[in-house]
């Protein structure tokens, strides 16, 4: 009986320690990602995608402030700043991509136009996850 009680206390303590570590790690990573900018190259959706369904089920529309990213959750808000002119746009992730290596986002044409010229094709930007 005494051995069982001591074992239960040890297991409970171990679970509390592991849970504390897990929660602390999640909070630390989340805060770091939201407080600092990262650099990347971006592009925008081609005309042929207008009116097609995205991976989230939304219908893609050129004028909406949306973007594709490989891993960010659908609905995530991201601030993107053009390094060359400091113009910024806030987009919502609603699709998966881009497929080109070295690019973190494909923006809707409307979002891309807010920070750059479509004729440029790609832009060097910095970005941070807002929520």
Model-derived regions: residue spans:
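Secreted/periplasmic proteins
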Residues: 2-13, 19-131
């Amino acid at each position: 009986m005494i051995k069982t009680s001591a074992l239960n206390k040890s297991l409970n303590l171990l679970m509390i320690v592991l849970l504390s570590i897990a929660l602390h790690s999640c909070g630390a990573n989340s805060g770091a990602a939201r407080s600092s900018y990262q650099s990347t190259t971006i592009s925008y959706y081609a005309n042929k995608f207008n009116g097609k369904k995205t991976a989230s089920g939304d219908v893609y529309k050129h004028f909406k402030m949306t973007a594709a990213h490989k891993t960010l959750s659908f609905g995530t808000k991201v601030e993107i700043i053009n390094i060359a002119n400091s113009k910024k746009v806030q987009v919502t992730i609603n699709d998966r991509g881009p497929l080109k290596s070295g690019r973190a986002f494909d923006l809707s044409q409307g979002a891309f136009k807010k920070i750059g010229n479509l004729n440029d094709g790609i832009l060097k930007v910095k970005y941070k996850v807002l929520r």
